[in-house]
Amino acid sequence: MSSVVSDQMDIESSSAFSPAEPVVDGAFVSKHNLSAEAYQGFKECADSLLSGKIAQNEQLPFIQRTLQICENVILNFEDEKQHLMSDVLLVWAMKQQKLSIATLHTQQLHYKELDLINLQFEYFGELLQQTLSGLDYLKQYYPNVGFEEVHSKVRNLTHYFLYYSIIVSRQPPSVIVKCGEAENHRRSRFWFNTEIRILGGSAFGIDTNNENSNVNCYLITDETAKQLLNNAYLDIFESEEFCIEPNTSTFQKKDARGIKAKFDDMKVAKKVALRRDSVATKRYCLCYNIQLQTNCGIELVGKKVSLPFAVLVGPKADVEAKLFLERSFADLVRHPLSDIPTHVSCAEMADALEMKFQAIIETPQKNTDGPSVVQPRKFNMQTKQHLVMRMKPNNQGFLPLDNFMKLPVAEEFQHKKSASAEGDWKLVPFYDWFFKLAEITNKYLYSMWYDGLVYGFCSKEDAENILRCIPRSVLLVRFSDIEYGKIKISVKNRNGEIRHHWYEHADLNARSLNSELLSNHKFSDVDLIYPDIDLEVALGGRNKPRIRLPRNLAPDEIYFDNQGAAT
């Protein structure tokens, strides 16, 4: 089974972690060239008819030939539209869903891909607009010969294309915790930004006709969202429990990258007093009311709905874990509000865990702190394999998602309230163990993690094998596999002996691990932090013990004369 997992893990990660070179969409170029060639044939025919160059007795067969060319134009347009909608925008949106659990840096890299997509939509939109314009004249000067039907087909294709060019380009987080001023709570997300963006559309005047126009946003339940799937014109009523602020924005065009409506610093406010359990099982969506004008008479009216999320009245880790699985693995773009699958591949889970860990350690400590946009540190292959193996994949290399939520992987000693020395051991499921270590890294080990001084996820046996390969004295900072929320320091001294020390997060709150490694005598004979980082250089140097020097006495004669008085 481990070989199956290894083969899966060797597959290149599908996540966007670093800037990529601009990719030329060869399929789009090919399809667009075919569309442009077909349009050119239509344009030549239209110019001939409208210029009066065709003799009266030749007009009817020429019109029939033009109509046949129009059908070919429509076929090419449909093919290009299908590519842009399915192979480009749908793929982008599905990846957007998966990356919505990742760091702002990773999400921003993906967001920038919309600039190229916007350009592709502009190119296709220009062809559609020019074709519609030509057909407008043809049906006016040559009525009742078939141009009305062609115009209707192209207009419907254009309407569809323009409406689905309106996207939720920035999604809300999977969990919004509404818990007062609990600034220190992990991953509390009081404020977030969303955005509606229109791709292309300049040829139809969408940018000029709708700049500064309002767009309203509503907080709706998933039940209302399900009704919208069947009726896009459904009257929307806000959730009775929460409201969203701000609930209105305006479309703005600040560059040549399309028109956008930004909803910055959004937050959820309670309308009534609520119990945690009353809302923990519910899902909510943001619904944006769209009403846009074009210069060709097409009106774009409808509603755009965000990915679902949970609103919690206070922290609830198991709900956060379930929403992590939903955003990572459910097919919410093609099948809105669909269920989470029962199994996923090891590679998919490894990528999702990596992005979630990166996002948690980038979470601001306080809701007053600004967002951090830095390139995250990647997991190495050993880390990914270690994590997925802890969830016990099956022989085919797939992981039951129930194991993420329910499989015990660690234990925690919980003291009884009545007696501090007594208590019971509690089993901790994978998600709680994993989230806790990410939280500890965020609060106590942030700099060391980014400097590569924390190895991270590693078993005791693997740590010992790793250390034996290093000829000098070395230590390795890792997360405990068995004991909940503990940091382990595995040390190989200069004699080759290996020992392990552990620290609870409360210990790290009292004194940083950096200071502990420099000042504790247990680590005084250690030269390196794994793999070959000089400990003193990395951590700032040890405090050398002060060597007591003999006092330089220079007694005078009076000193010796008085020595007899002392005896």
Curated annotation (Swiss-Prot):
What's the protein called, per UniProt? Answer: Signal transducer and activator of transcription b
The superkingdom listed in its UniProt entry is Eukaryota
Partners and quaternary state? May interact with sodium-dependent transporter snf-12; the interaction is probably direct.
Task performed by this protein: Carries out a dual function: signal transduction and activation of transcription. Required, in concert with transcription factor elt-3, for up-regulation of the vacuolar H(+)-ATPase and acceleration of lysosome maturation at molt. As part of the innate immune response to molting and injury of the adult epidermis, positively regulates the expression of epidermal antimicrobial peptides, such as nlp-29.
Which CDD domains does the entry link to? SH2_STAT_family
Q: Which organism is it from?
A: Caenorhabditis elegans
Family, per entry:
Belongs to the transcription factor STAT family.
The answer to whether UniProt assigns keyword Transmembrane to this entry is no
Q: List, in alphabetical order, the GO biological process terms annotated in this UniProt record.
A: cell surface receptor signaling pathway via JAK-STAT; defense response; defense response to fungus; positive regulation of antifungal peptide production; positive regulation of gene expression; regulation of cell population proliferation; regulation of transcription by RNA polymerase II; response to wounding
Disrupted gene: resulting phenotype? Answer: RNAi-mediated knockdown almost completely abolishes induction of nlp-29 expression upon infection with Drechmeria coniospora, or upon injury, or in response to phorbol ester PMA.
One CC-aspect GO term: nucleus
Q: Which UniProt keywords apply?
A: Activator, Cytoplasm, Developmental protein, DNA-binding, Nucleus, Phosphoprotein, SH2 domain, Transcription, Transcription regulation
One GO MF term, please?
A: RNA polymerase II cis-regulatory region sequence-specific DNA binding
Q: What is its main location?
A: cytoplasm
Q: Where is the SH2 domain?
A: 449-548
Q: Where in the cell is it found?
A: Cytoplasm; Nucleus; Vesicle
